[in-house]
Amino acid sequence: MESLGKAAVAEFVATFALIFVGAGAVIVASSGQLDLVGVALAHGFVLAVMVSVTGHISGGLVNPAVTIALWTAGRIGTQRGAVLIVAQMVGAVLGALLLRY
C-alpha cells in the first residue's frame, strides 16, 4: 500500500503541475503576452518533466484518460486505477482553482 500511496502523490503532483502550468500559459496567452508556440512549449516541457520525475514511481501517467485506458486493457488493477484517477482529478481541480484565485 505504501507504493500505491507514493504513486498517488506522484500522480497528484504531476497532474497539478500540468494543469497549473498548461492552463497558466493559456491565461498568459489570452493577454497577448504569449503565442501558441509558447503555450505548446509550456505543455510539452511540463509534461516531459513530470513524466520523467514520476515515471519510476507511478508510471508517469499524468492523465486520467491514460489511466482508464491502462485499466481497461488490464495493465493496472482496479484499486490502483481508482486511486490514481482520484489523485489525478484532485490534482487537476486544485491546479485550476489555484489559477482562478
Region locations from a protein language model:
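Membrane-interface helix-loop junctions and terminal tails of multi-pass membrane proteins
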Residues: M1-Y101
